[in-house]
Every structure is written in C-alpha cells, then in structure tokens.
Amino acid sequence: MTGILYHGQPNGPSFTVLAAAFEKGVDLERRPIDLVAGDRHSAALPHPIEVDQSIEGEGPVLVVGDVAMTDSVFLACYLDDIGTGPAIRPADPYARWQMMAWCRYVIERVAPAAAALGNAAAPPHTVPAGIASADLAARWTDAVEGEADATQLADSRTKIVQAVEKIEAQLADGRDWLMGDFSIADLESFAWLAGMRALVPQAFVASPRVDAWEARLRARPAVAQALGLATVPNPEAIWAPGPEINRWG
Amino acid sequence: MTDVTLYHWEPNANSGKPMLALFEKGVAFDSHYLDLLNFDQHRPDYLAVNPLGTIPAMTHGDKVLTESTAIMEYVNEAFDGPRLMPADPVDQWRARWWMKFLDQWLAPSFSMIGWSVFVGPSVRQKDPAELEAAIDRIPMPERRTAWRKAINGAFSPEEMTESQRRVGLGIGYLEAALVQREWLASGEYGLADINGFNLAYAMPLSQPQLCNDELTPNIMRWLRAIYARPATRACWALGRTDLARRISLLESEPA
C-alpha cells in the first residue's frame, strides 16, 4: 500500500491521477467520494492548506503517510517517480520543459474554461458546508445559482476551440502523442476536454487528428481501467467547481 | 562564451525567478535586459524570440524556453551545479504545489496591487497616442486588457479588495509553512524559495502592517537568509530601478 486516493468520477483531475496510477502500476487504496456533493470538504479527509487551498478546486487528494497531496499534474509527477511502469514524463530536460509548459497551459487556460462550462451545464444542487477557501466557496455559489457570466462562458468556449486547434496542430507531424512519447500531457489534456465534445461541439467539427488521438488514448489499458471506475454512464458530464478563471482576464 | 541568453526585466516577480535560479546554479548567461515600462517586450526583435511577448524567455543554444517556473525546472535539470529541487518525491510535489499556488493565486494579487501603484503611474505620463500604439502591439489579448487596466487605473474596488484579502491570507500561509520547515517546501533551499523570494522580498516594505519581525518572524528569517546568499546579491545587482533596490530593507536586523 503506497497511499490513499480520494477521488471523484474519472473526469477532470480525478481522471488524470487515476490513469497515471494505473499507467505506473502504483497500487493505491482508492476511496471514491462524491465531489459534487462536497465530500472533499468533510471531516473524513485531512485539511492542510494544500488540500483546502488547492488551485485545482475539486480535485483528488492523495494521502501518503501524514502528507495530503493535491493538484493532478504534480500528483502524476509523483506517481511517475514512485511507480514501476514506463515513464510518463520525458527524460530529456528540454522535452520535460515542453511537457510542463504544455500542462501549465492546460491548467491555467483550458481547465478553468472547461470547469466553468461543465458546471454551467450540470450545476451542483447545493453549496456544501465546510469550504475553507472563500474564493472556492464563491465558485460553488455561482455554480449552484447558475450565475455564470455570459462573457466568461463565451470566452471559455473560445478557449476550448483554441485548445483543440492547438492539439490538432501538435499532432500534425503524424505523432501519436502530444510530446512524442505518451506522457502526463496526454492525460491532463484529455481529462479536461473529454466532456467538451458535448458542450462545445463546434470545437471538434474538423479535428480528425484529435479524434484519432482520443481513440488511441481510450484504447490504453490504464485509461480504460480509469474510465471503467465510473459509477455513472457518462463520467465526463460530472463536474464540480474547478480552478478559477484568471482574474487578470 | 556562453550559449545561454536570458531576456528579462528587473530581478523581481517572473523575471527574477530564472535569473536567480541561474545564479544559484552557477550558470553563466548573457543578460538581455528588457525595459517593461518602455514596452521593449513587444518590439519585433523580442517577438522574434518569443512571439507571445511575455517576459522572461531563455535561449539555450537553439532552444527557446518561456514560462518562468517551467524555465527554472529546466535550469535545474539541464545544468550541473547544486540541486534546486529536493530529492524526495513528496518534497518535490510540495515544491511544485507551492510554486503553482504562488504563480496562480498569490502573485496575481500582488501584481494587481503593484501594477496599480507602480507600473500604471510609471507609464501614464507617456504620450497617449504612443501608449495606445504600444498596447496595440501586444500579442496576447489578455495582456492588452491588463495593460489598459493598469494604465487607466481601472482595477475595480472589488478587484483591489479581493487582491488585498488574498495578500493578507497568503502572508499567513507562508508564515505557517515556514514555522513547519526551514525552507518553503522542504529542509533544503530550492526553486520554491527562489519563486517565493521574488514575490515576497519587498513585503516588509509594501505590507508592513502584515509582514514584520513581530507578526511574521519566520518569513523575515527566510527572506534575510535568502538575501544573505551570494547568488541573490549578484542577481539583484542586475536591477536598474528602485523596484530592485527595495531589497536593501533586508539588511536590517531583526527588531
């Protein structure tokens, strides 16, 4: 046993971490929680700053010993270090920079847009008690009350269209995976975009390489295993408040 | 002769992160200073290096790198010299968690305040037509919006209040972390400290009511310890404005 993973449905950050753990053969004790019901804020989980102030919002929590860790890309880096499966980060420093810069783009631009659109389409019913972060609590309130700003939603759809274009361009040289070899960048990009096919269909009307990439991804045993943990028919339609949209615009 | 060039502004915020990492690592580099307040970063010769027009950028041979925190990880991995990420995978995770928290939550709040009190007033006296032309040259729409807001002093009271709320909380979080550990992410000095110092070195001056020897002794200990490092002195010597000179306040003894 190498840790306890509290996770939601295999969508968004919970997907990234589950799939990374399976890719790396890390045997975690999985404790599924209902992120949409606010389980992450219950007393059953530890609440250090790294859990309560995670930039990611309602993401998974990995507890190793007395340390509770959050933020899916960095959890995947950790799993890459401790697991025995094939590497999910490039070894070359420049290739690794490319992967981390790509993930930063997804974290900062794509994830907030996807979370905003996902929550607007499937709002949570109530704001859970016990949210320590006032700004996360405000995102919950906005989501529950359907207060999404029309300008922000339009901008979010643009961000999804741009992300699909960026992936399509990245795959233009015929490569199978975003960084050449399969990596965390593939998992994190898919994690946030899987649910966007239904919500921003216009992004996918001319994206044959993205379509083939997604099919390759879904065919990976670890990805199938992660998606197979869903307890609902469409896990990509399940959203809880995620990272905030950049306050600078 | 070096094959590393860093395009940067002051040793401060994002520019200072790869600068200080290179100094700590002992990597010689060509320093290419861009005057942010003169919009050097949006001129064609720099856009040829980084089409997004963001600072900093680094070239290593024919490789071009952007995103200051990602550049720091590259500097740590690509060159010999002292290790700037902890060896333990959990500590590495913590270093990355803190850098993301600083980059995406605390730094934008500090910079909103900094832009409204420093950057905006500094460029506002320029010719309006010239300013407008300079803003039109900015490649990223998000940055155009931010510059317009800074120049026009158009951050709303709600935005400023929220930024000040986050600064207050963030100082508390930093102090709490530094009560637990000698350095921000682990028992070793590293990239999280370099990142944090670039954000926090002037806090005792800009937020004296929140950050001082009485209220935040561990932040003050941490800032003074980083200031005492030769790499920090060398790095801040590249500063050209009063912004970088604020670091001298760390010469004071604990009260």
Regions found by a protein language model. Give the residues of each.
Chain A
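GST-like domain detector, emphasizing the conserved glutathione-binding G-site
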Residues: 1-137, 244-245
